[in-house]
Amino acid sequence: MSSAPTTPPSVDKVDGFSRKSVRKARQKRSQSSSQFRSQGKPIELTPLPLLKDVPSSEQPELFLKKLQQCCVIFDFMDTLSDLKMKEYKRSTLNELVDYITISRGCLTEQTYPEVVRMVSCNIFRTLPPSDSNEFDPEEDEPTLEASWPHLQLVYEFFIRFLESQEFQPSIAKKYIDQKFVLQLLELFDSEDPRERDYLKTVLHRIYGKFLGLRAFIRKQINNIFLRFVYETEHFNGVAELLEILGSIINGFALPLKAEHKQFLVKVLIPLHTVRSLSLFHAQLAYCIVQFLEKDPSLTEPVIRGLMKFWPKTCSQKEVMFLGELEEILDVIEPSQFVKIQEPLFKQIAKCVSSPHFQVAERALYYWNNEYIMSLIEENSNVILPIMFSSLYRISKEHWNPAIVALVYNVLKAFMEMNSTMFDELTATYKSDRQREKKKEKEREELWKKLEDLELKRGLRRDGIIPT
């Protein structure tokens, strides 16, 4: 009895080095609805009359029925299944959005649990796994949520619900609780930027309306960031969470609490270390500046933190750090500047000396900033000695003529600020260079003598008498 022919293994299983582009194309074909559910048979929803077509006395009950109908989830992975019912749910959601926006008296106490239930049924789900080795958020297209035609309207409805003049947090807090917020925060890892944008608005509204949830929300964002920095280095919604935090920090009362200062130093500063910094750096820098505008005394720990995590091998990140540093210097108090000027300008001197012209250029652009120039001028007796040797050397040796031109402008500015010290430093630099050249010449002569001596010994060993 012959056995049935075996199917050869697929390429996926045997080729561990299949081309990334092929794997990505295959991924795209199989993407991506986290709303996937196997349907045994077509879903049938009983059509209900439009809310505007029934008497106002019947609208509250019909509103609840429509909310319950919208709890039914469809399989958007199968583009041909339940087309009529998918369209019916979409039109019902649209109707609910309009109704909650226009109608008065629609938010009764009975509607709150049904609204939260409908929203929860639709948005809370396990997100599809994202292989961080495969997906590069800087280069690759994100995986879009297939069920977005429904999901978008659910988010739109929920935002209108939260923004309604009739919305009562005292009733809603029974249903929008810590568990709800925790599930909401998990959704920020969605690859779909459209969803993260809606989530940002939703969380912001919840933070504004539920005073009892504020500390919990901050703590959970803190936990997400710590896990991101020290464990996973993968979370899609960092930029959006930082954007929300920017508004939250702006509203902090003074004096700042110890927990807020700790969040800055222990969480926000270490966020600079991750590889994907470019995806959220603008929002991170904004948060840092907000803190410093609230409490200038935090300037020193922030600057020292940036110096500690300054990139050693990534020029792109160095340029970002320099940009952020300029934003900080734009709001720095002169009294705080004095405390950090030495370590700061030692780092700037290194950047100016960088062989990577974009790093050097970005550092030299500081001298185009009027406020920074005024700070430098007030403290030129400290800053000029730190910067001088690097600037003078670059003016003679740098490979890029554009950088040399910028350096000449900086040297000219320093000369106008403090001509006496400039002349002294120039004389000292030239004297030091002459001394170095003399030592170098002596070293070369010594090596030449040693080589000659070794050569003579070799000749004697070979029986040749040198003349």
UniProtKB/Swiss-Prot annotation:
This is Serine/threonine-protein phosphatase 2A 56 kDa regulatory subunit epsilon isoform. Gene3D superfamilies: Leucine-rich Repeat Variant. Residues 1-40 are annotated as: Disordered. Signal peptide: none annotated. Keywords: Acetylation, Cytoplasm, Phosphoprotein. Its main location: cytoplasm. The modification N-acetylserine is found at S2. The modification Phosphothreonine is found at T7. Found in a complex with at least ARL2, PPP2CB; PPP2R1A, PPP2R2A, PPP2R5E and TBCD. PP2A consists of a common heterodimeric core enzyme, composed of a 36 kDa catalytic subunit (subunit C) and a 65 kDa constant regulatory subunit (PR65 or subunit A), that associates with a variety of regulatory subunits. Proteins that associate with the core dimer include three families of regulatory subunits B (the R2/B/PR55/B55, R3/B''/PR72/PR130/PR59 and R5/B'/B56 families), the 48 kDa variable regulatory subunit, viral proteins, and cell signaling molecules. Interacts with SGO1. It is found in: Cytoplasm. One of its GO terms (cellular component) is nucleus. Residues 30-40 have a biased composition (Low complexity). The lineage of its organism: Eukaryota, Metazoa, Chordata, Craniata, Vertebrata. The modification Phosphoserine is found at S30, S32, S34. The B regulatory subunit might modulate substrate selectivity and catalytic activity, and might also direct the localization of the catalytic enzyme to a particular subcellular compartment. It comes from Homo sapiens. Phosphorylated on serine residues.
